[in-house]
């Protein structure tokens, strides 16, 4: 019930699980569709702008924030996790992070998005927000690993600095 997940039995989303996202006032700001059955098209997303703060209504901005790619990744990470519905941080999220200034932001993108994760981290550091790059093992994602393993990876993540980001970008 927390995420208000639904299922479509008719229409263009027939056979898809629908995961809605709500803004801070409780208004629908985005949704993702995921096929319940094996499909050539497992994801079906709207053509709407992704310049939203995913699951904003569920975020406690006074606590540490987790940023990840998708809704199912967010479920695998647990509380206070914002899916960015892709690899790039939306402008609205950038602005809200600067406004709210959380004490720690854990950046948790898939391994194939390491460069994007470093860019997100650099933006946070440029705005004096502590960034931690949480790297999931190759070939997995947070949704595969689950909350307990993700908590362990988050707990062991070290804070980034600009020098470390540059070193990591050079190694890509």
Which ranges hold each PLM region?
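A generic structural motif
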Residues: 131-141
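Acidic, metal-coordinating catalytic cores used for nucleic-acid/nucleotide bond scission
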Residues: 88-90, 109-118, 141
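Short, aromatic/basic amphipathic alpha-helical patches
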Residues: 116-128
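Phosphate-handling DNA/RNA-contact segment within nucleic-acid enzymes
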Residues: 9-104
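Short phosphate-binding/catalytic loops that engage adenosine nucleotides
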Residues: 82, 128-129
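TOPRIM metal-binding catalytic domain and adjacent DNA-binding surface shared by DnaG-type primases
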Residues: 1-18, 22-25, 59-60, 95, ...
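Acidic beta-strand-to-loop metal/phosphate-binding motif
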Residues: 67, 103-116, 135
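Short, surface-exposed amphipathic charged segments that create phosphate/polyanion-binding patches used
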Residues: 98-102, 141-156
């Amino acid at each position: 019930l927390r995420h208000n997940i639904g299922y479509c039995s008719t229409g263009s989303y027939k056979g898809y699980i629908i995961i809605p996202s709500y803004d801070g006032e409780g208004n629908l700001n985005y949704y993702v569709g995921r096929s319940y059955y094996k499909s050539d098209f497992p994801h079906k997303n709207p053509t709407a702008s992704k310049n939203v703060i995913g699951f904003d209504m569920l975020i406690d901005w006074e606590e540490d924030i987790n940023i990840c790619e998708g809704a199912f990744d967010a479920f695998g990470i647990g509380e206070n996790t914002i899916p960015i519905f892709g690899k790039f941080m939306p402008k609205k999220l950038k602005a809200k992070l600067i406004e709210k200034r959380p004490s720690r932001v854990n950046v948790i993108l898939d391994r194939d998005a390491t460069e994007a994760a470093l860019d997100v981290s650099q933006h946070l550091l440029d705005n004096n927000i502590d960034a931690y790059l949480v790297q999931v093992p190759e070939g997995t994602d947070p949704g595969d690993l689950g909350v307990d393993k993700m908590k362990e990876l988050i707990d062991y993540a070290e804070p980034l600095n600009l020098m470390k980001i540059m070193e990591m970008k050079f190694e890509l």
